[in-house]
């Protein structure tokens, strides 16, 4: 069941609601204007929500800064509030105060109603097992870009000593005594499973060792938060994370790292529209793989202390061969926005998606807009991946440049939705992009930012 903005109204998260104007859920985009100007990106969606969950583990208040006003933050705020955490958010300052001193069990029906379209609820397991000895986790939402199983998560929790009971509408978990540290190797360096293990191990008894862990910058920032809270965690260079469990954790004060997915999305928009955009809050170190690719395609950038400027230098863009991967590779979430820019590159580009098996569904609408994109089951252009033998259309060949023309399109998922905005901005004529509230999940004030960059957009 998906939560609507109304669902949050009784909670103290009003400023997070964002667009609730009652207007139609669509944006008209008059394409053809190069994006130009300066915008700011705040904290990373895929870190902020996890740090908020981590606050549950502390005995004292936490303060998180640089928090964007996006729907995923509202969903997590709602769930934390239901469990007795006092949440106060100031959208203008981007500061969220979290007081977990009165944590309590929530009613199943309410949890279900507040889970929204997010995957974050699964990360409540460890903290709730430590705080309350039990947890109910509703069926998860999230973007339809693959099957997105949670088998690694459940295996981790079972090994720590939790009883996992799948019920209609969700999963009930119970701690059989104090959770105990484990030694485990992930079959794949999953971001969520690594976070699950971290949030559970920090207060489990004894040592936990995870091999083949994900080491995304958002995970490292979560580890920094947990260390501030009193955890003992080391990260080795070979994807091994070791955690010494402690009895108590306190609150934290932390400033979230910037959203490198949002930054790369705007950079791709600058490239696809022939524009010039400076992104405050974008940082080189977390975006190195993207910057290399941006340069290979023919885009230019300039790194400054507080921002990165991205622009199209004029002339043709170059086709590339690209493979998505876990960090430090090219992020899967950068793929969809960049593919739109690749429709404007000369020659054949090959993109091999190795993180999600179904992340090219969004290309249907791009084809409708004039792009020439073919999808293949084979692993093209790189080493075979785990999807190669499984019949998934996970490689794309993009032939360009092709002029894009306006169309009426429906947002399929968060990043695919932003890609449609980029395509509509690059296209000739007036496009209608429907279902834009999905984009609110991860892009703060995107309409205002579009307008600030000179885009001709209006709500339906
Ligand atoms: N996987 C399993 N079993 C599991 C968990 C994962 O097979 O129990 C598989 C997935 O099906 C997928 C792969 O492992 O094929 C990677 O999934 P991962 O667990 O790393 O992804 P996630 O934690 O569900 C987060 C982000 C995604 C981002 C990925 C990869 C959040 C809330 N989501 O998802 O972000 O694409 O890591 O970096 O942090 C987005 O922001 O639009 C988004 C989809």
Task: List each language-model region with its residue ranges.
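Short, structured segments at the rim of ligand-binding sites
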Residues: 2-460
């Amino acid at each position: 069941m998906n939560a609507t903005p109304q669902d949050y109204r009784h909670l103290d998260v009003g400023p997070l609601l964002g667009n609730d104007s009652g207007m139609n859920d669509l944006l008209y985009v008059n394409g053809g204007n190069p994006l130009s100007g300066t915008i700011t990106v705040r904290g990373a969606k895929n870190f902020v929500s996890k740090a908020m969950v981590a606050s549950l583990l502390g005995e004292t208040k936490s303060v998180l800064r640089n928090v964007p006003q996006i729907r995923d933050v509202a969903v997590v705020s709602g769930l934390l509030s239901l469990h007795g955490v006092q949440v106060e958010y100031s959208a203008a300052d981007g500061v969220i105060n979290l007081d977990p001193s009165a944590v309590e069990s929530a009613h199943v029906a309410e949890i279900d109603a507040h889970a929204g379209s997010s995957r974050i609820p699964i990360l409540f397991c460890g903290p709730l097992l430590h705080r309350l000895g039990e947890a109910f986790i509703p069926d998860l939402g999230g973007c339809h870009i693959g099957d997105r199983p949670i088998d690694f998560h459940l295996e981790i929790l079972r090994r720590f000593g939790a009883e996992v009971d799948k019920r209609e509408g969700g999963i009930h978990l119970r701690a059989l005594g104090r959770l105990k540290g484990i030694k485990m190797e992930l079959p794949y360096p999953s971001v969520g499973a690594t976070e699950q293990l971290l949030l559970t191990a920090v207060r489990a008894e004894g040592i936990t060792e995870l091999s083949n862990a994900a080491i995304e910058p958002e995970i490292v920032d979560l580890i920094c938060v947990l260390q501030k809270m009193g955890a003992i965690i080391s990260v080795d260079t070979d994807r091994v994370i070791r955690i010494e469990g402690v009895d108590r954790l306190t609150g934290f004060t932390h400033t979230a790292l910037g959203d490198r997915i949002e930054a790369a999305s705007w950079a791709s928009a600058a490239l696809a529209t022939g524009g010039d955009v400076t992104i405050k809050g974008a940082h080189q170190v977390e975006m190195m793989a993207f910057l290399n690719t941006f340069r290979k395609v023919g885009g230019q950038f300039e790194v400054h202390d507080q921002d990165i400027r991205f622009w199209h230098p004029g002339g043709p863009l170059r086709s590339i061969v690209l493979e998505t991967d876990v960090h430090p590779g090219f992020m899967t979430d950068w793929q969809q926005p960049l593919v739109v820019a690749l429709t404007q590159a000369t020659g054949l580009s090959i993109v091999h998606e190795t993180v999600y098996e179904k992340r090219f569904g969004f290309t249907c609408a791009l084809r409708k807009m004039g792009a020439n994109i073919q999808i293949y089951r084979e692993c093209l252009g790189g080493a075979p991946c785990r999807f190669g033998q499984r019949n998934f259309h996970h490689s794309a060949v993009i032939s360009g440049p092709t002029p894009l023309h306006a169309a009426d399109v429906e947002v399929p998922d968060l990043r695919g939705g932003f890609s449609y905005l980029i395509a509509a901005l690059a296209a000739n004529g007036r496009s209608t992009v429907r279902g834009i509230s999905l984009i609110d999940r991860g892009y703060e004030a995107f309409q205002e930012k579009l307008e600030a960059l000179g885009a001709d957009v209006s709500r339906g």
